[in-house]
Amino acid sequence: MKLHHIALAAIAAATFASQAQAAVFNGATSAAGNVATEFTIGSALSFDLDLVSKAPITLNFTLESADFSGDAMTFSALVRNLSGLGFDNVNVTLSGITFAAPAGTITTDGFSAVSAYGSSATQAWASFTPGVSSEFYIGSPLGNAGEVNWTLNLDGLQAGQQFSVTVAVPEPETYGLAVAGLAALGFAARRRKAG
């Protein structure tokens, strides 16, 4: 009987020891009381982000040698809107690392629809109709059918390097100002070309 317990303890220890931590989470930076809670298991970086404002939140990481063991590193987040304001869109921006193919998903809890979405090597974005007032999902933090985590590309990176993931829900006015600025630049360039 004693040997049986020792064998079970050894198997449990080996199981937990083989699950290397994905990357060291160095904390989050944000303004206005936004909170990040880490739920990382193995090589799957997973977070709950509780946003009380539209201020961006940046998650900071350091790679370890165990991160290059062959398991793909993935990212997911459940983003809760605690602000009472509708989130019209989301931008996820990477610094120091890139997304690997295939792209992951950005979905909602069903009270709003994803009206447009896209991604590049360092950014993923989505627009919501109507604005999300409850929560949305970057990747598959709850393991729901049809949702896919975002895979991070470790090619060319080394242990000790740092990277960050910034989640922002910008104000619609930000886009309006950007469009107005681009229109003004286009007008100035056209005028210069004509003159």
Question: Language-model features: where?
Answer:
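Mature extracellular "passenger" or substrate-interacting domains of secreted, surface-exposed proteins
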Residues: 23-168
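Short, threonine-centered small-residue motifs that mark membrane-proximal processing/anchoring sites
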Residues: 1-14, 18-25, 158-189, 195
